[in-house]
From Swiss-Prot:
Gene3D superfamilies: 1.10.246.140. Belongs to the ENY2 family. The gene is e(y)2. GO terms for cellular component: cytoplasm; DUBm complex; nuclear periphery; nuclear pore; nucleoplasm; SAGA complex; transcription export complex 2. The keyword Secreted does not apply. This is Enhancer of yellow 2 transcription factor. Keywords: Activator, Chromatin regulator, Cytoplasm, mRNA transport, Nucleus, Protein transport, Transcription, Transcription regulation, Translocation, Transport.
Length: 100
């Protein structure tokens, strides 16, 4: 099991997944990331406009790596701290991400 999968299952089981998603969503909005990605999508669509067969899946494939690189380090760090805090708070609980 990867660390990502363990964290994902643990946060889902502990009920903290929604809190983490809400935190990430609000921080990405606050820092302007959503607007940057929206502009990136528009730019790609204008560039590919002549290609009528350009699909949503192709757009997502092209945008995803660039969008991930645009996430500010401060947001990544805050999210990591939040996840570590959740693990520390639940350390004594019966939820074991390896058993999930």
């Amino acid at each position: 099991m990867t660390i990502f999968n363990a964290v994902d299952k643990f946060t889902m089981m502990s009920g903290d997944r929604v809190k983490i998603k809400d935190l990430l969503s609000s921080r990405l909005t606050e820092c302007g990331w959503r607007d940057e990605v929206r502009l990136l999508c528009r730019s790609i669509l204008q560039e590919k406009g002549a290609i009528s067969s350009f699909t949503v899946e192709q757009l997502v494939t092209e945008v995803t790596p660039r969008a991930r690189s645009l996430v500010p380090d401060a947001v990544k760090k805050e999210l990591l701290i939040k996840i570590r805090t959740i693990f520390d708070e639940n350390e004594d609980d019966d939820i074991d991400p390896e058993d999930a």
